Structure formats: structure tokens, C-alpha cells
């Protein structure tokens, strides 16, 4: 168990599944469940009941599409609602959310969110999205939208667990918890977290 102290009561960690952060013990953390509806509902409920939260840090796994390496953690600041791709009406303001970058001298990426596991990257509409998608997941757009509605800062980090192809389900199962150490290191280096030392 990795025990951290959170010195900022206004910061909340959000992820879909506890198996993505199996050893991290700190507070507060919300495990939303998989998919946009579960993610949005769980986060909105928590923010409504805890008005002190001013920043949400989302961590989760994602499939790699372009410009990423499997096994690495990336900051994401652009989020696409992929399930609008078949809509015949142009809805640009509803399709993408962009939040300010927060890490200096670091490229922040673009993630496409949909309610199914992507095993064929050709299904993504590169024409609509301007060929800018780096990653795919199932929650981040919904979380970014909720934070936008509540006026809360949203910092998102995605660990590339698979290549969003026919081998993705097996790769995800194998790698779902592999990014935890990188995320913990990031919390310690960029946020107000520190190790909790056991009393002697």
C-alpha cells in the first residue's frame, strides 16, 4: 500500500476503477465506474456535496492512437465527444472541450471519449477531428464537462495501456495497473502530496 498525505483539501483524484490505482491510499479519491454516464454522475454528485473542491485530477488508462508510447503517462487538455461523429449537424462547441495547460514546457494531448472499448482506430473520424486525436478512453470528456459546469479546474493524465487495436482488451487487462507508480511520482512532484510515514 502506498500511503500519501494530501495537503490540499481542494484537490480531488478521480479514476474509473480501483484496479487502475490498486495500492494508492490517500484522500479524497472517487472511483466513478466505467463510461461517460457513470463518470459524470459520480463526479457531479461529489462536487455538489463538497463545495471546497477546486481542482479535479483525473487518472486513467487509455488506448494510444498517435504520437504516444505504450507504457507512458501523458497530460491531456483537449477532450472530444466521439459519439457525435455520426451526427449530420456540425456541433463544434459541443464536440470538443479544451482546458488550459498546467505543466510548463510539456505538450498536452487530445483524447477522444466514447462509450465503448476501441479495438479499431480507423473508426475515428479524422476529418471531423482534424487528425488530432492522440488517445481514446471512456470517461475524460464527461469529467471535463462536469468540471466546466462546476467551475472547477480539470487536470487529466492518461496512461497508455494498449494500442487501441484487436489486441487491446488483452493488453488492457495486463497493463491496467501498470501506470500507478508514474502517477504517484507525478502527485509527489507537482501537487501537494507527500508520503505518509508510519510511526516508529
Feature map (PLM): residue ranges:
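Glycine-rich phosphate- or other oxyanion-binding loops that anchor nucleotides, phosphorylated ligands
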Residues: 18-200
Amino acid at each position: 500500500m502506498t500511503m500519501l498525505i494530501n495537503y490540499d483539501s481542494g484537490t480531488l483524484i478521480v479514476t474509473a476503477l480501483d484496479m487502475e490505482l490498486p495500492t494508492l491510499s490517500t484522500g479524497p479519491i472517487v472511483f466513478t465506474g466505467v463510461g461517460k454516464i457513470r463518470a459524470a454522475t459520480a463526479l457531479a454528485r461529489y462536487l455538489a456535496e463538497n463545495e471546497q473542491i477546486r481542482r479535479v485530477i483525473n487518472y486513467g488508462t487509455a488506448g494510444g492512437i498517435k504520437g504516444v508510447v505504450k507504457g507512458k503517462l501523458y497530460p491531456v487538455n483537449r477532450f472530444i465527444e466521439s459519439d457525435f461523429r455520426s451526427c449530420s449537424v456540425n456541433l463544434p462547441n459541443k464536440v470538443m472541450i479544451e482546458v488550459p495547460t498546467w505543466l510548463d514546457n510539456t505538450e498536452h494531448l487530445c483524447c477522444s471519449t466514447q462509450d465503448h472499448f476501441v479495438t479499431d482506430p480507423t473508426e475515428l473520424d479524422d476529418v471531423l477531428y482534424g487528425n488530432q486525436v492522440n488517445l481514446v478512453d471512456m470517461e475524460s470528456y464527461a469529467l471535463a464537462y462536469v468540471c466546466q459546469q462546476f467551475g472547477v479546474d480539470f487536470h487529466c493524465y492518461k496512461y497508455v495501456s494498449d494500442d487501441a487495436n484487436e489486441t487491446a482488451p488483452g493488453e488492457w487487462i495486463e497493463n491496467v495497473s501498470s501506470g500507478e507508480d508514474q502517477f504517484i511520482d507525478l502527485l509527489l512532484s507537482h501537487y501537494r502530496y507527500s508520503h505518509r510515514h508510519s510511526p516508529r
